[in-house]
């Protein structure tokens, strides 16, 4: 069906735009949707030749739909519809004339909506092509930032260990300083006698007390 549509494209371009129906445009929209999915899949799998071929086909379809949209006449306003309908009623054929205009307006609106969907699909395909390298770069940056956070957290743990070791050493030095302070106080209480003599006097006084 896709090849048939591509063969019909040059023939339909020479026809009057009223020959283009909404069903014909919908077929092109369905084909464009499948082409977009194929383009994304081929980009992810690294099939560059297939991706380029699908992109070229999508571009041709979108250019054809854009040409149809540009050649479509603008729908008449509501005032002109009612005015022409009133004139037709005066002439005796207002009912059928108004109905024909209503149907033509609805068909033009459906065609324009289909063409707007085609243009939005083209923008989506272009955004997918542009965002893919940026998404890969953002993923790499996120990976590097996570590695940096892990290394920094590891350094923080080692620094915390050094702090604990320093505090433990400080407590150890403070404990060793306590006997020195006690021995110094004992020396002052005994009138500056030597450390050995002070211990002997302390033992003798203990024996006398027993």
From Swiss-Prot:
<dbReference type="GO" id="GO:0009955">
    <property type="term" value="P:adaxial/abaxial pattern specification"/>
</dbReference>
<dbReference type="GO" id="GO:0048825">
    <property type="term" value="P:cotyledon development"/>
</dbReference>
<dbReference type="GO" id="GO:0051301">
    <property type="term" value="P:cell division"/>
</dbReference>
<feature type="region of interest" description="Disordered">
    <location>
        <begin position="135"/>
        <end position="210"/>
    </location>
</feature>
<dbReference type="Pfam" id="PF05030">
    <property type="entry name" value="SSXT"/>
</dbReference>
<protein>
    <recommendedName>
        <fullName>GRF1-interacting factor 1</fullName>
    </recommendedName>
</protein>
<keyword id="KW-0010">Activator</keyword>
<feature type="compositionally biased region" description="Gly residues">
    <location>
        <begin position="182"/>
        <end position="198"/>
    </location>
</feature>
<dbReference type="GO" id="GO:0010468">
    <property type="term" value="P:regulation of gene expression"/>
</dbReference>
<comment type="subunit">
    <text>Interacts with GRF1, GRF2, GRF5 and GRF9.</text>
</comment>
<dbReference type="GO" id="GO:0010449">
    <property type="term" value="P:root meristem growth"/>
</dbReference>
<keyword id="KW-0805">Transcription regulation</keyword>
<comment type="similarity">
    <text>Belongs to the SS18 family.</text>
</comment>
<dbReference type="GO" id="GO:0003713">
    <property type="term" value="F:transcription coactivator activity"/>
</dbReference>
<dbReference type="InterPro" id="IPR007726">
    <property type="entry name" value="SS18_N"/>
</dbReference>
<feature type="compositionally biased region" description="Low complexity">
    <location>
        <begin position="135"/>
        <end position="152"/>
    </location>
</feature>
<comment type="function">
    <text>Transcription coactivator that plays a role in the regulation of cell expansion in leaf and cotyledons tissues. Component of a network formed by miR396, the GRFs and their interacting factors (GIFs) acting in the regulation of meristem function, at least partially through the control of cell proliferation. Appears to function synergistically with GRF1 as a transcriptional coactivator. Acts together with GRF5 for the development of appropriate leaf size and shape through the promotion and/or maintenance of cell proliferation activity in leaf primordia.</text>
</comment>
<keyword id="KW-0804">Transcription</keyword>
<dbReference type="GO" id="GO:0048366">
    <property type="term" value="P:leaf development"/>
</dbReference>
